[in-house]
């Protein structure tokens, strides 16, 4: 009887390890488990997120004024991801965060033979993401063209910009320079995002679904180890110094944004977090968001 019980326990441990202890990215999961992110909405996670956010009077006011949007994806169990959001489809100016749209468009172009993957292109992609270098970003925009970026963002495969659901990711202006523009049609924004679409981007990236697994892994390598240690990263450096961080942020005037895939050594610190803020104190708000969001995630597990 004891041997049977131990054998059963060993099998259970193996199963749990297979589900929860994946350390490699992109995730190695059955494609049939990769569902549309909106279908992974969790009412319990939503309730916990709202409770944490609305407990702060300033955040509550900003959310009600549609000047603050937050999205989270719980990846502690990759086969049972959970999604929650506040002002999820409300599109805002997002400054440099939409440079992730340039990165995906470049990978799509490279994979299709439309753009040569030279040493200069590789260097510019890394500078664009890790240091948010405007000159490198503009060079990448000029290599691709606005039409290519728009085509990838509106591609039915991704639909990262969807007019029927509030818009989404968009890059229609060079960074730090003049020239022609291609603003998005709903709000005439040049650099735009919604937290839902950015969460979708990271979710598909983590699952190896952006272009293909090879290109997704390459994008993850570019986005890992950010060289700007503010916003989400400032807090995570302190509370999770060994966690792997994949991120892109942005700031311009009162607009502050950040997006991150956190991959901790322990499964209960594996999640996607996105915030868009229109407030002069947005950078500090984003720093302060991490701990309440992690509480919401932990409370969902209980």
For the regions a language model picked out, list residue spans one by one.
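Bacterial Sec-dependent N-terminal signal peptides
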Residues: 1-24
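Structured C-terminal helix/loop/strand segments within mature extracytoplasmic catalytic/sensor domains
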Residues: 22-53, 201-302
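Acidic helix-start/capping segments at beta-turn-to-alpha-helix junctions
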Residues: 64-76, 120-133, 142-146, 170, ...
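Active-site SXXK
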Residues: 92-115, 128, 273
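Short, well-structured active-site flanking segments
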Residues: 108-126, 212-216
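Mid-domain, small-residue-enriched loop/turn segments at the edges of structured enzyme/sensor domains
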Residues: 140-210
